Amino acid sequence: MGMGFNPIKALFTGIGTVCVGVGALLSILCIINQTQHNIAFQNIYFIQLNTTSIFSVANQTAVVNNTSNLLNELTGTLVDTLETYIDQGATDLIEQVEQEMKDVSELPDWYSIGLWNYCQGNSSDYTNPTYCSTPSPSYYFNPLTMLETSINNATGSQINITLPSEVDLGLKVLKGACYAMRAMYILGFIFFALTIVSIVISCLPFFGPLFLNVFSFFATIFTFIAAVIAVATYRIAISELEKNIEILNIPIVLGKKIYAYSFLSAAAGLAACILYFIGNLTSGYSPL
């Protein structure tokens, strides 16, 4: 078809460019996440820790049940009445102690973990944080550091939590994974941007199609790797934390938006690769 205008190629290239734009936009949302707090960046976090029950007594039910079982071995109206008062009294006392400990500690009700920082807030609003740490390129998810900081700020004291060697090693691995994930997200966005820039030379017979396909391919790969690292890292982190700090009763959940954005961004990049490739084939040559 020579160097003339090819409407079919233009159509595929145009749709592919829209996919690249979508991928780049979603990539930006993943990278910025908790560093901004307007409506576009709400609830974009990797995991959220719920600390509303951190002071609950883990064996509350066991204590009450053991008391009930002991009293059930006896008979009589007086014993039945006494059992009722003990059950209710134990529950009320525990709830009162939990609330007083919560009020004194001034710990937040939740923490959300982002790419550059963490945020915390109250149970009355799980969307808008009351505080976010300063975004930093050296930040990585360390739950014990977060708790230490919150407790020290609330009490004005200096508390240091000592970890077993295997847990400390796990945090170092987690640190490396967080850094790698951050690098993959940034590289993915850079290649999305390079893909958009290379559109201006896409009319060139060889280098134009080559750059479009190569840049969109690497944008897809890096974004997908970032998403996989994020899912694997934080699923393992949740499993280990729930196993090792079960006594603290801190439920942890994965975020939804950031993983959806990550995989959709990679899918958009993949769609762009395919569309660019098909468009180039209609010109009678392949960039590969």
From Swiss-Prot:
Glycans are attached at N33, N50, N59, N66, N122, N153, N160. Residues 1-11, 207-210, 279-288 are cytoplasmic. One of its GO terms (cellular component) is cell division site. Its main location: Golgi. The chain crosses the membrane at residues 12-32, 186-206, 211-231, 258-278. Signal peptide: none annotated. It is found in: Golgi apparatus membrane; Cell membrane; Cell tip. It comes from the Eukaryota. It is a multi-pass membrane protein. The keyword Ion transport does not apply. Residues 33-185, 232-257 are extracellular. GO terms for biological process: fungal-type cell wall organization. PANTHER family: CELL MEMBRANE PROTEIN YLR413W-RELATED. Contributes to the wild-type cellular response to nitrogen stress through signaling pathways that regulate the expression of genes involved in amino acid biosynthesis. Required for wild-type filamentous growth, cell growth, and cell-cell adhesion. This is SUR7 family protein pun1. It comes from Schizosaccharomyces pombe (strain 972 / ATCC 24843). The gene is pun1.
